[in-house]
A protein has these predicted regions:
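Extended, non-globular alpha-helical segments
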Residues: 51-57, 109-124
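Short glycine-enriched, charge-decorated loop/helix-capping segments at active-site entrances
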Residues: 51-53, 199-205, 275-285
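Auxiliary Fe-S-binding modules of radical SAM enzymes
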Residues: 2-19, 231-332
Length: 332
């Protein structure tokens, strides 16, 4: 149905993905598999089950999941503790989720209608009005559910609510074009400029993404670009210089702001709960030196005339100055 989406989460009072105080709706499903992604529960579009084995209180003291599972042979135990599920045999009935008293089994994703979402959104209308905020739809890749995004943003605009779409832009243009009339602001990433490296670290090449970014700029669409800065993957001079050249020469520097998001090691427990490998587990780096590198990258972009912030808000400039001061002090 056009007015239903598979929702991963709704967060109220968010501050970083668009102006003001916002309600952020995360949709399930993503065509990318970024090595550094902290939200593996967003990969698949359908509803999934995560297993947190450290929360299991054992078959001996509980066993509720075994009692309700129609295919209990899919439950994988070790020392009487639930470890994982056989996802090939799981029917997705979610009975185990409802019965587990310790929340060792978690449901990722649920169906919600536009009306359901608007009920949540309207609760914070006063905060949007006072702060210049609104609604942000993110993912996953929300444009995999472009019909739902269209209907929800249309409902928001009918009530005068600011809308922001955070998207990888790795979709066909018709999906973007569909939501344009009701989207005030786009947020997207430039992860790597080299298409081969982009595919190596995200699973897809970047040609469609860069093309769609250029099309949005040509339409004078308000656009925030971000670089998730990942040590030893995209923080090298070659990639940074190529990104600056693209923004200056291909986009004519027509972006609202470029934001640098420093890598944080997040989501490892969620990967384990879904039976997926966490590719950044062995990545080793020194946090202070890496953050100094990120600040240096921001300096480079600003010197090139590209308005660049470390993280997402103007107050990050103060943090940036503090890092520079500390770096100078350490060098004395």
């Amino acid at each position: 149905m056009l007015n239903q989406g598979i929702i991963l989460n709704i967060q109220r009072f968010t501050l970083h993905d668009g102006p003001g105080i916002r309600t952020e709706i995360f949709l399930k499903g993503c065509p990318l598999r970024c090595d550094w992604c902290g939200n593996p529960e967003s990969f698949k579009r359908g509803i999934e089950i995560g297993v947190y084995h450290n929360k299991c209180i054992s078959i001996e003291h509980c066993g509720s999941c075994l009692e309700v599972c129609p295919e209990n042979k899919m439950l994988i135990y070790s020392d009487a503790m639930l470890q994982q599920i056989d996802r090939q045999q799981c029917t997705g009935c979610l009975s185990c989720v409802d019965e587990c008293p310790s929340e060792a089994i978690k449901q990722w994703g649920d169906y919600m209608s536009v009306d359901d979402c608007m009920t949540v959104i309207r609760k914070d209308r006063g905060f949007y009005d006072r702060s210049g905020g609104g609604v942000t739809i993110s993912g996953g890749e929300p444009l995999l559910q472009s019909d739902f995004v269209y209907e929800l943003f249309k409902a928001c605009k009918q009530e005068g609510i600011h809308t922001c779409l955070e998207s990888s832009l790795y979709v066909n243009w018709n999906r973007i074009e569909k939501v344009l009339p009701y989207t005030d602001l786009f947020i997207s990433d430039i992860k790597l400029m080299d298409s081969t490296l982009h595919k190596q670290h995200t699973g897809v090449d970047n040609r469609k993404i860069l093309k769609n970014i250029k099309l949005l700029v040509e339409l004078d669409q308000e656009l925030i670009l971000r670089i998730p800065v990942i040590p030893s993957i995209n923080d090298d001079d070659t990639n940074i210089e190529a990104t600056a050249d693209f923004i200056k020469n291909e986009l004519n520097n027509r972006v609202s702001v470029l934001q640098l998001l420093s890598f944080m090691r997040l989501g490892e427990e969620k990967y384990e709960s879904l039976g997926l490998p966490y590719k950044m587990k062995t990545l080793s780096f020194e946090r202070y030196e890496f953050q100094a590198r990120v600040n240096g990258i921001a300096d480079y972009f600003n010197q090139r005339g590209i308005h660049c912030l470390v993280e997402t808000k103007e107050q990050s400039k103060a943090e940036h100055a503090e890092y520079k001061q500390n770096k100078t002090s350490r060098g004395r």
